[in-house]
C-alpha cells in the first residue's frame, strides 16, 4: 500500500464566512442568521408580538363581559315583558293555583261529588286574604278534575260508540266539540246572569269553569253503568249523580253568590236576595239537564 494512504487525510479547514455585521454594498437587509439563538431554541414570532397578547386580552375580556351582561339584561327584560303580556290574556300564575292538587285531594273531591250529603263544612279556607291551595282544602275549586273528567268523558264516549259500531273520528270530534261548546255557553250564561243580578261575588270565570266541569264525573259514571248494566243502570246512576251535583252546587255557590248576606248573618229575604237564591238554584238545576243531554245518545 502507498505510505501516504496509511495516514488519514488532514481535515479541511472550515472557511469562515464574512462578518454578518458588515453588509455588502449590494445587500438590502442585514443577515441575522448568524446571530445568537433566543433562549429555548425558538425564534420569536414577529406576526404576533408577545407584548400585544396581554393588552389584547385585557381589552377583549371587559368587552365580552359587557356584551354578556347586556345580552342577559335584554333577555330578562324580554322575558318579563312576554310574561306580562301573557298574564294579561291568560292568568298563568292564577291558573297554576287550580292545578295544585294531590292524590288525596282528588280522591276526597270525587267522593264529595258523589256523596255530598254528609259533608258539613263548605267554607273555603283563606290564608292572608288568599284561598289556600286545593290540596289543603277540599272545598276549594280546581281544574284538574274537570279537565281530566272531560278527557275521560271523550274517551268513554268513543268506547260507547265503538260498542255500537258507530265510531268514527268525525263523530268523536263532534262529540268533543259539542261538549266544549255547551260548557262555554253555560259559563257565559252564568256570567251574564251574575251581571244582570248585580251580584258582588269573588267568583271568577275560572271558578265557574271548574264548578261547571264537575258534572263530567257523574256523566262518566252514568255512561259506564249504561255500558255494563244497560239503560236501567244508566238512569239509576245518572239520577243519583245528578241529584248529588245539584246538592253540591247549591251548598257551594250559596256561599259565593250570597256572600254579602252570609257575612253579615242576614237571612235571605227581600227581592234582591231571593233573586240571588233563585239564580243559585237555577245554576244547580241545569247541571242534570246537561248531563242527560250529552250522554243519552251513548247508551242504547
Swiss-Prot record:
Superkingdom per UniProt: Eukaryota
Spans traversing the lipid bilayer: 143-163, 179-199, 206-226, 228-248, 279-299
GO CC list: endoplasmic reticulum; endoplasmic reticulum membrane; endoplasmic reticulum-Golgi intermediate compartment; endoplasmic reticulum-Golgi intermediate compartment membrane; Golgi apparatus; Golgi membrane
Main location: endoplasmic reticulum
Keywords associated with the record: Endoplasmic reticulum, Golgi apparatus, Membrane, Protein transport, Transmembrane, Transmembrane helix, Transport
Cell compartment(s), UniProt: Endoplasmic reticulum membrane; Golgi apparatus membrane; Endoplasmic reticulum-Golgi intermediate compartment membrane
Extracellular-side positions: 164-178, 227, 300
Region (Disordered) location: 1-46
Topology within the bilayer: Multi-pass membrane protein
Cytoplasmic face of the membrane: 1-142, 200-205, 249-278
Any one GO BP annotation for this protein: cilium assembly
Family membership noted in the UniProt record: Belongs to the YIF1 family.
Function in brief: Functions in endoplasmic reticulum to Golgi vesicle-mediated transport and regulates the proper organization of the endoplasmic reticulum and the Golgi. Plays a key role in targeting to neuronal dendrites receptors such as HTR1A. Plays also a role in primary cilium and sperm flagellum assembly probably through protein transport to these compartments.
Identification of the protein by name: Protein YIF1B
Organism (species): Xenopus tropicalis (Western clawed frog)
